[in-house]
Amino acid sequence: MNVKILTLVIVLVVSLLCSASAGPMASTEHSKEIEEVGSMRTPLRQNPARAGRSQRPAGWRRRRPRPRLSHKGPMPF
């Protein structure tokens, strides 16, 4: 039982240390410079064929095709 608790505490401490030291949450003085450099990306050009009207109108739904009556089976309607 003590081994389980000990391993749980060790995993918890390690995960807290890793999460505290990692990533964008850490505040540094040059973080604004990094943000400015990161925001200098050129915007992607959209494909003009995609930017136009969509192929189907907004309220359009695909209708279920009526079953053929040529095959023998239960009456569809």
Swiss-Prot record:
Sorted UniProt keywords: Angiogenesis, Developmental protein, Gastrulation, Hormone, Secreted, Signal
InterPro entries: Apelin
UniProt function note: Peptide hormone that functions as endogenous ligand for the G-protein-coupled apelin receptor (aplnra and/or aplnrb), that plays a role in cadiovascular homeostasis. Functions as a balanced agonist activating both G(i) protein pathway and beta-arrestin pathway of APLNR. Downstream G proteins activation, apelin can inhibit cAMP production and activate key intracellular effectors such as ERKs. On the other hand, APLNR activation induces beta-arrestin recruitment to the membrane leading to desensitization and internalization of the receptor.
Superkingdom assignment: Eukaryota
Name of the protein: Apelin
The keyword Transmembrane helix is assigned to this record: no
Keyword Chaperone: no
Compositionally biased region (Basic residues): 59-71
MF (Gene Ontology): apelin receptor binding; hormone activity; receptor ligand activity
Gene Ontology cellular-component terms listed: extracellular space
Effect of loss of the gene: Morpholino knockdown of the protein show impaired gastrulation and heart formation. Embryos display reduced migration of anterior lateral plate mesoderm (LPM) cells and cardiac progenitor cells (angioblasts) toward the midline during late gastrulation. Embryos show altered cardiac gene expression. Embryos with CRISPR-induced apelin and apela null mutations show a strong decrease in the angioblast migration to the embryonic midline during late gastrulation.
Annotated family: Belongs to the apelin family.
Organism for this UniProt entry: Danio rerio (Zebrafish)
Gene Ontology biological process terms in this record: angioblast cell migration from lateral mesoderm to midline; apelin receptor signaling pathway; cell migration involved in gastrulation; cell migration involved in mesendoderm migration; coronary vasculature development; determination of heart left/right asymmetry; determination of liver left/right asymmetry; drinking behavior
Location within or outside the cell: Secreted; Secreted, Extracellular space
UniProt main location, coarse: secreted
Species classification: Eukaryota, Metazoa, Chordata, Craniata, Vertebrata
Site (Important for the balance between G(i) and beta-arrestin pathways induced by apelin-APLNR system): 75, 77
Leader sequence segment: 1-22
Gene giving rise to this polypeptide: apln
Segments of this protein annotated with the region Disordered: 21-77
